[in-house]
Amino acid sequence: MTRPRVASYRFMVLVACSLILASCAHDTYQERADQIKNHSGAFYDNLKSNRVESAIRDNEQIEAMASEMGNTVRKRAGQQGSSTVEREFALMKTANETAATNWLALGQYFAIKRQYPQARATYRRMIDTYTNPTDRPHREQALRALRDLDMIDPPTTTSPTNP
């Protein structure tokens, strides 16, 4: 009778170990989604605290993640129908859209603070960086923001002086 008990305990220990190991396995997709969320939250927290440089670094981290995911998707493009590639592509789009939205928010931050040259530079950076067809709505919003800035703070023109 002790033999079946020992076997039963071994089985229970084996099941418990399997469950523990399974819970330790990482879902890299979820980890990266959480990283994007954390960097985006930190971006806005830094803007609220007027730590612009830190906010920019957080957004650059999101851009780097999107770029890395884009490379992974391109390398695995031949594996069509792969749920891993589809998840990676969806996460890449999310990271890219998040970063673009954050740049627009940074431009708005500068405009509110009446730092018009920085706002213009931020919008131009966004327009120059996000050139894919899927980025069009963000580019158009940045172009509208530039036109709005021109109404608030017309660009200075240097005219030649007459001697």
Name what the model sees in each region.
Residues M1-A25:
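Sec-dependent bacterial lipoprotein signal peptides
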Residues I20-A42, I56:
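Bacterial Sec signal peptide processing site at the extreme N-terminus
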Residues Q30, M65-Q79, A90-E97, D128-Q141:
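Short solvent-exposed coil/turn linkers within tandem alpha-helical repeat scaffolds
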Residues A42-D45, S49, Y109, L149:
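Residue-level signature for tetratricopeptide repeat
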Residues G78-W103, Q108, R144-P163:
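Alpha-helical linker/edge segments of TPR/alpha-solenoid repeat scaffolds
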